[in-house]
Each structure stands twice: as C-alpha cells, then as structure tokens.
Amino acid sequence: MSIVVKNNILWVGQRDWEVRDFHGTEYKTLRGSSYNSYLIREEKNVLIDTVDHKFSREFVQNLRREIDLADLDYIVINHAEEDHAGALTELMMQIPDTPIYCTANAIDSINGHHHHPEWNFHVVKTGDTLDIGNGKQLIFVETPMLHWPDSMMTYLTGDAVLFSNDAFGQHYCDEHLFNDEVDQTELYEQCQRYYANILTPFSRLVTPKITEILGFNLPVEMIATSHGVVWRDNPTQIVEKYLEWAADYQEDRITIFYDTMSNNTRMMADAIAQGITEVDPQVAVKIFNVARSDKNDILTNVFRSKGVLVGTSTMNNVMMPKIAGLVEEMTGLRFRNKRASAFGSHGWSGGAVDRLSTRLQDAGFEMSLSLKAKWRPDIDALELCRQHGRDIARQWALSPLPVAEAATTPEPQDCACAAAAAADLGPMMQCSVCQWVYDPAKGEPNQDVQPGTPWSEVPDNFLCPECSLGKDVFDVLATEAK
C-alpha cells in the first residue's frame, strides 16, 4: 500500500516487522525496520531506491499497482546496499533500459551485487541536477562514507524534500510514516541507537557534510529517510541532533560491562558502581553482563557515556571471548572523548586485565588505573573495588565534586626512611614472557612473599602470577638495568 508523502510523492516501500538482525547479526533491530522507497510523479516519473532483496517480488507487484512500469522514466539509487537496491534485478527484468542515476562508486557496488554491467547507468556528482518537469529538479549530493563510499542524498526542489539515504534514519517499524505520529521516546532512542552503532565511526565527516548541504541554502520541509519515519514536523531537529552527536558527544554517565565465569567479576562491578554513586549521586551508572544483554544497547550506552569500566575474568591467560569481541567493535566504532578502566578477577593467572587495558587504549580511550582481584573478592577486596569507584567518580567528574576529608599522611622523616629502605631492596624484576613486574616493595602476598622482600630472597618455587612460569624467566627491569 502506498502512502502520500507530499503532493506527487508516494511512499512505496516495505515494512519489516519481523527482522531482528541487520548487517548479519551485528545489529539487533528490536523494533523491526522499514525499507523506504519513493515514487515521484511529475512530468517525469522517478523511483528513489527500492527495498531489501527478500521483498523483491512483492515490491515490483506493489509498484505495478501505482504505475505502469514502462512509464517509469528514471531510477535513482542513493545507496547500493542490498536493503536499498536489493530489488533492482527483479525490477530491471521488466524495464531493462531504464536509466539509473547514482554515484560512480555505486556502479561498482551495484555490479558487485547484481552482475549487470549492461544496465543504463548515469554517474552523478554533487551539484548535478535532473529536470523532472513541472518546474522541479532533483539535485544530487554525494555523501561518501555516510556510511558507504557510494552514498548520496537527493533533494527535490519545489517540494523541498531531502531524500537523505541512511542519514537521519532509524531501524524502527510503525504503521505510521511520519515522525509526529509515533512514540517520541521510542523514536529518539532508535535514532540514537542507529547513530551510535552505525554512523559513529564517521562522526568527523558528519559535521562538514551537513555544513556543505546547509550551504546550498535550500529550504528543507521534509526529510525522507531510507529507514524508519519521514521527518515532516520540524524536520531539522534530527539534523541538530546529528551535529550534537558528532561533536565528541558525552553525557554525565558511566557504563560498566563485564563477563564472568564464577560471579566474582560481577561482585567487583557492583562494588565499583556503589563507590561511584557514593561520591557522585548525580551520575548515571548502568551495568551490563555482556552474556545477558543486547550488545547494541551496551554500545549505545558507551556512546552516551563519559567513561566505561570493562570487566573480565581470565580464561587461558586472556580475556573472555565476548569481552574481546565487544572491545574489537568499540575499536571499529572509534568512540571519542571517552575514558576507560579495566578490572577483573582471576585465579592462578591474571593476564586478562592487562591485556584488556592495552586493547582499550588501542581503541582510543583515555585510560585510568586498572583493578584486579584474586579468586572471589572478600570484604577487603570489595572495599578496594568501592574505593576504585570513588576514585573514578572524582577523576571522571565533569565538574568538581566536594572534596573528601584528607587522609592522614606519614611524617616527612617516615617517608624518607621508607624511601631509603625501598632503595636497599634491590631492583624490580620483569617476567620475560608476560612482562609482569615484581616490585620488592610490594612483594607478592598471594604467594606469601611479603612487602620488602628483595628478589634474592624470593623462594625458588615462586611462580609469575600472570603466566605461572618460574623465577628463571625473570630479568632485571629494563629501566633499572643500567
């Protein structure tokens, strides 16, 4: 069934209430989606995009009810991905000579999917126009990497409608087409989820591209997206949101997510959260177990947050697989203006937290100190977790928090004595396999090696707490080997 968008513009797309996975299984479409295609009927008849390939036959059948396919003058493909151009093969079987207007990159993508280089392609660039009669034109604007190299937008003069492709859309299915007809809270949530999980890597391109489009000084009375609602009520509100989200966005929010084998890392997460809210009751704190939570919800919360704490148990001396996968996704999303800290519980070997810290730093996060607990955290260990949360709350505060009472400090002469004593303990030693460092001043209490024990007095049965290898793999720490 078609819907009148405005004047001679019809929506001829397809709702998909059942879809729950997008881009393979990488994006959960919990509210379904729609594949928006538009038919413009002026002196020339124009089709803007098609629908997902799984609805190809239905799409062509429905389009026949609106127009004799032979009367279709032009096809515009804003984006060659299969959820936009998937029905092209079915359609072109009926009208093989119809001109297709798209970017040069789109021709490569379309041929890669459909394998019909003989189709009647016409390459367009930013500023190119196509006269469709009745005093109206289509103006094309290339938008490479928002979010594919082939992407573009199309503007219809006279009606002042911007066919925006993936930008400003959302995976959101509703029987109503327009933004003022649907639940506003749901709509906003799905818009932000869409931006956070799909467009965040390209945030640096969003602002200049929007500025370029606004520079045309064209009125925009509607924004017709490729997924979700058409923006007709205050359509530029979503443009303003994109500019906000693209500008190193953060809220006063901290996200904690973790995976755990024996519930120990969960206990740490809860205690850290308690410490944060104890010091800063105003900050929003959300905790997710990655094994039981929607991945895209977690990533959306990370996008919204000023910082993230990531927890993992140690398995085979590395982090849990679901944590590793999610951190890899965060690396690809290239979040900006975020801080991070790693934490986790381990048994005989604890390499995961250090590995996780390195991965988070590689992903572009500004790192704070990490936190480890051996085995199941006891009362003292949980207090350390709460203190870690208190420290994080102060370090990550967007504005200064009330200063806590100062802790009692040792007398200066005591500090001097302690420093002198530390100097007599000999060098720190580093494991040549996993780079764990033995500090004589700290010892290794978990193996009954007390603080203040020089390396020469460490028992021969000592094992590296990270990789479980013996003393023979340790060397003097490079910074001290002079």
Swiss-Prot record:
Q: Where in the cell is it found?
A: Cytoplasm
Q: Tell me what organism the protein belongs to.
A: Klebsiella pneumoniae subsp. pneumoniae (strain ATCC 700721 / MGH 78578)
Pathway linked to the protein: Nitrogen metabolism; nitric oxide reduction
What does UniProt list as this organism's lineage? Bacteria, Pseudomonadati, Pseudomonadota, Gammaproteobacteria, Enterobacterales
- Start and end of every Flavodoxin-like domain? 254-393
Q: Which UniProt keywords apply?
A: Cytoplasm, Electron transport, Flavoprotein, FMN, Iron, Metal-binding, Oxidoreductase, Transport
Residues passing through the membrane, by range: none
Q: Which InterPro entries match?
A: Anaer_NO_rdtase_flvorubredoxin (IPR023957), Flavodoxin/NO_synth (IPR008254), Flavoprotein-like_sf (IPR029039), Metallo-B-lactamas (IPR001279), ODP_dom (IPR045761), RibonucZ/Hydroxyglut_hydro (IPR036866), Rubredoxin-like_dom (IPR024934), Rubredoxin-O_OxRdtase (IPR016440)
Query: Which PANTHER family has this protein been placed in?
Result: ANAEROBIC NITRIC OXIDE REDUCTASE FLAVORUBREDOXIN
Q: What cellular component GO annotations does this protein have?
A: cytoplasm
Any single GO molecular-function term of the entry would be:
nitric oxide reductase activity
UniProt-annotated binding residues for Fe cation 1: H79, E81, H147, D166
Annotated region Zinc metallo-hydrolase: the residues are 30-210
SUPFAM superfamilies on file = Flavoproteins, Metallo-hydrolase/oxidoreductase, Rubredoxin-like
Q: Which family does it belong to?
A: In the N-terminal section; belongs to the zinc metallo-hydrolase group 3 family.
Cofactor comment text: Binds 3 Fe cations per monomer.
What is the annotated role of this protein in its UniProt record? Anaerobic nitric oxide reductase; uses NADH to detoxify nitric oxide (NO), protecting several 4Fe-4S NO-sensitive enzymes. Has at least 2 reductase partners, only one of which (NorW, flavorubredoxin reductase) has been identified. NO probably binds to the di-iron center; electrons enter from the NorW at rubredoxin and are transferred sequentially to the FMN center and the di-iron center. Also able to function as an aerobic oxygen reductase.
What is the required cofactor set for this protein?
Answer: Fe cation; FMN
> Which PROSITE patterns does this one have?
FLAVODOXIN_LIKE, RUBREDOXIN_LIKE
Q: Relate the assembly described in the record.
A: Homotetramer.
- Where, in this chain's numbering, is Fe cation 2 bound? D83, D166, H227
Q: Where does FMN bind?
A: 260-264, 342-369
Annotated protein name in UniProt: Anaerobic nitric oxide reductase flavorubredoxin
Sites where the protein binds Fe cation 3: C431, C434, C464, C467
What are the residue boundaries of the Rubredoxin-like domain, all occurrences included?
426-477
By its UniProt entry, which Pfam families does this protein fall under? Flavodoxin_1, ODP, Rubredoxin
